[in-house]
Amino acid sequence: MWVADMDFQTAPEIQEAIRERAAHGVFGYSIVPEEWYQAYMGWWEHRYGFSMEKEWLVFCTRVVPAISSMVRKMTTPGENVLVQTPVYNIFFNSIVNNGRNIMESPLRYDENAYQMDFEDLERKLSNPQTTLMILCNPHNPVGRIWSRD
């Protein structure tokens, strides 16, 4: 990465502040401002007419930790989590590493595109031990964008 060369040295106070922050060792998002929550909730309200409470939200900086958090919060150990295969392999880790079972509903390849097998999906989701489905949209790796239809 390139930055402009300055005509003068950086102030000692700035250098020290950078050293102190670097010594902390955590470089991700450590503070989530209230404005972020308001913007997120406002977007859902404006776009879909759906109101939510701030307490319902869990801020995550990446998809994989978010999926693992969702699996832990919405299921209990030993329950099944359904995924439509082929699917991003990290989903399997998020399920198994949290003590849950993988339930696969393979996608069908028809007419040059992947399709959901709704009969298989319904059968597997009717199992009382299958308590969560991870819907990947757009689907990775098949690239399919699922529509309401």
Task: Please tell me what each predicted stretch does.
Residues 97-103:
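A short helix-loop-beta submotif of the ANL/AMP-binding
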Residues 73-95:
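Conserved PLP-anchoring active-site segment centered on the Schiff-base-forming lysine
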Residues 2-62, 69:
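N-terminal small-domain helix-loop-helix segment of the aminotransferase-like
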Residues 107-149:
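Active-site phosphate-binding strand-loop segment of PLP-dependent enzymes
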Residues 52-57, 77-80, 129:
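Short acidic capping loops at alpha-helix termini that bridge into adjacent secondary structure
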Residues 9, 67, 91-92, 142-143:
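Glycine/Thr-rich phosphate-binding loops of Rossmann-like dinucleotide-binding domains
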Residues 85, 104-109:
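Short beta->alpha connector loops at strand-helix junctions that form conserved
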